Amino acid sequence: MRIVVGISGASGIPYAVRFLENLRGHDTYLVISEAAKKVIQYESDENIEYIRSLASHNYEDDDFSAPISSGSFLFDSMVIVPCSITTISKIAAGISDTLITRAAAVSLKERRRLIVVPREMPLSTIDLKNMTYLSENGVIVAPASPGFYTKPKSVDDMVAFVVSRILDLVGVGNDLIKRW
């Protein structure tokens, strides 16, 4: 399975790291935004080199010659995790000024699965309208909202819950959580 992964500048880097760790064996194409690089320094015990090592292919966010910027390059899904509100707003407005937003635009025009994982809270009416617009256009909006019916005992358990759901959405089997 070919999966494009974008990491934008929202809080929630542990979701991205755990997601990539669980995609081993799949063909992954990773883009880390400039803002995400800063968030990684503040929020993660992992360094950028480790995160990049989890992907099969790595691209800079300004590399419009990357294959994922073209509709003729076939991939199964794109996941932006975490997805900043700025990135959601750009995608909703059709702005493709970064490789992440360009690959998202390709996903939309080619009718490929696009999943955005916002972590922001609270949300403004504008944020909600942008997410609604994306959903109406086939994007899966999967907020990073852990379930508590699994009785998580740690932050890692809560991260596992969200990542398990994202993996389910892209069709990658996993046993990160106890299922009903």
Swiss-Prot record:
Pfam families: Flavoprotein (PF02441). It catalyses: dimethylallyl phosphate + FMNH2 = prenylated FMNH2 + phosphate. The keyword Transferase applies. The keyword rRNA-binding does not apply. GO terms for molecular function: flavin prenyltransferase activity. Its EC number is 2.5.1.129. FMN binds at residues 9-11, 33, 84-87, 119. It comes from the Archaea. Keywords: Flavoprotein, FMN, Prenyltransferase, Transferase. Dimethylallyl phosphate binds at residues 149, 165. Belongs to the UbiX/PAD1 family. Flavin prenyltransferase that catalyzes the synthesis of the prenylated FMN cofactor (prenyl-FMN) for 4-hydroxy-3-polyprenylbenzoic acid decarboxylase UbiD. The prenyltransferase is metal-independent and links a dimethylallyl moiety from dimethylallyl monophosphate (DMAP) to the flavin N5 and C6 atoms of FMN. This is Flavin prenyltransferase UbiX.
